[in-house]
Regions:
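Short, solvent-exposed polar/charged micro-motifs at secondary-structure junctions
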Residues: 71, 126-130, 172, 181-182
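Short secondary-structure boundary/capping segments
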Residues: 17, 21, 65, 128-130, ...
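An anion-binding loop in the catalytic cleft
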Residues: 140-237
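Acyl-group handling in specialized metabolite and lipid biosynthesis
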Residues: 129-142
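Glycine/proline-rich, flexible active-site/cofactor-binding loop segments
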Residues: 1-3, 7-9, 205, 225
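A generic structural signal for well-ordered coil/turn residues at beta-strand boundaries
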Residues: 55-58, 69-70, 75, 132-134, ...
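Donor/substrate-binding cores of folate-linked one-carbon enzymes
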Residues: 3-127
Length: 237
């Protein structure tokens, strides 16, 4: 073979495999990485970009080396992150972009038998650590915007969640709501309407739009609230 291609591997390539790809007259191993390196090296760049509230991300085609996403970059392209973006939707957009970019890189190699690249910048290095299930539990004491970012980042895995009456409820969609002017407990239900369930947070409030109870289907938040008998003033854990 002429070149080895890896997509979203998230780990350090075994030395034995790396050495095979680096033999003479081969282009080495190329990685399609879902971030604008050196930001978000590591296993979960899409999740962490949304969780951090980044406005833009992208794809980098990089020449792999023995480090974790430390190799020189052959090409990169940006992609905006919308206010409603989830990891699921952004993953699909980046996958399409990455597919187009790797074809361009391989065509370039086929024509010229080389792939010019540039070393990554020293400044701006961040690491996208692996997502853990325990991160998904919502902390209502955080500000509404931060909670919304986490909900979108953890959709589809592991799914942001809270507890109510012993049941673990997953939150799939939400939006930042109005600023709470009077004093309320973090996690207190402020309103239930066809728009969703509005919950007080450490700063502002958040509107829960789509929820799922254990063993159930994803349904609108107001439907679940009615089915489970939630009331304004109840506090979510």
């Amino acid at each position: 073979f002429d070149v080895m291609v890896v997509a979203a591997y998230g780990l350090i390539l075994p030395k034995e495999v790396f050495e095979i790809a680096e033999k003479p007259n081969r282009a080495g191993c190329l990685n399609i990485h879902a971030s604008l390196l050196p930001r978000w090296r590591g296993a979960a760049p899409i999740h962490r970009a949304i969780e951090a509230g980044d406005d833009v991300t992208g794809v980098a085609i990089m020449q792999m080396d023995l480090g974790l996403d430390t190799g020189p970059v052959i090409s990169s392209k940006q992609l905006a992150i919308s206010e409603k973006e989830t990891t699921a939707s952004l993953h699909d957009s980046l996958a399409t972009l990455g597919g187009e970019m790797i074809v361009e890189a391989l065509n370039e190699y086929d024509r010229h038998k080389e792939l010019p690249s540039n070393a990554q910048e020293v400044d701006g290095i961040t690491y996208a650590k692996k997502i853990l299930k325990e991160e998904a539990k919502i902390n209502w004491a955080l500000e509404a915007k931060t909670i919304d970012q986490k909900i979108r980042a953890f959709n589809p895995f592991p799914g942001a969640s809270f507890e109510k009456a012993g049941a673990i409820i997953k939150v799939w969609f939400s939006s930042v709501s109005s600023v709470v002017k009077s004093k309320h407990l973090s996690g207190e239900i402020l309103n239930i309407s066809r728009l969703g369930v509005e919950v007080a947070t450490g700063s502002g409030s958040i509107l829960l739009v789509e929820l799922q109870k254990p063993g159930g289907k994803k349904i609108s938040a107001d439907q679940l609230a009615q089915a489970m008998g939630w009331q304004v003033g109840d506090v979510l854990n």
